[in-house]
């Protein structure tokens, strides 16, 4: 996001960590950044905006699949016409791929995280696209 900011993009953001918000604000002094838990949704100032793009990187795997659906539907409503949500995270196309990665990871697998499985979100979001960029991560996109 700092690169986008450097190119003149207006940046808005939310993180549950006050410290992360503080560090980001130091790098992007004109950005509108807020502290808040995604499980409670976006803070009011962010809900009042409309966006060309919404980016989420390695943050939404803390939500259950049901919470992801609710949260993403809320984000879709905040997009401008032809806006897009881009999510970079630990993600898989299928449950089989996730289970294979979990087996390979063994004890280092984080059981507390709820990683994205694109095929399982597709019924809620027929427009969902998934592009893998490693064996255990990818970009999910939703366009309005």
Task: Report the location of each language-model feature.
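Class I (Rossmann-like) S-adenosyl-L-methionine-dependent methyltransferase catalytic domain
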Residues: 1-45, 86-144
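A short glycine-rich, Lys/Arg-flanked "PGG" loop and its adjoining helix->strand segment in the class I
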Residues: 69-81
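Short N-terminal helix/helix-N-cap motif within the alpha/beta-hydrolase-1
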Residues: 64-68, 95
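A conserved beta-strand element that flanks and buttresses the S-adenosyl-L-methionine
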Residues: 55
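Short catalytic micro-motifs in class I SAM-dependent methyltransferases
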Residues: 58-62
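An acidic, carboxylate-rich microenvironment
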Residues: 67-70, 120
């Amino acid at each position: 996001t700092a690169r986008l900011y450097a190119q003149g993009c207006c940046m808005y953001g939310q993180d549950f960590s006050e410290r992360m918000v503080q560090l980001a604000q130091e790098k992007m002094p004109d950005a509108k950044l807020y502290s808040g838990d995604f499980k409670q949704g976006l803070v009011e100032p962010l809900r009042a905006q409309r966006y060309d793009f919404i980016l989420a990187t390695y943050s939404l795997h803390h939500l259950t699949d049901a919470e992801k659906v609710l949260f993403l539907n809320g984000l879709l409503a905040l997009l401008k016409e032809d806006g897009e949500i881009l999510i970079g995270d630990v993600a898989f196309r299928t449950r089989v791929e996730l289970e294979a990665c979990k087996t390979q990871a063994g004890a280092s697998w984080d059981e507390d995280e709820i990683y994205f499985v694109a095929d399982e979100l597709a019924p809620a979001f027929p427009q969902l696209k998934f592009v893998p960029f490693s064996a255990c991560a990818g970009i999910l996109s939703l366009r309005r």
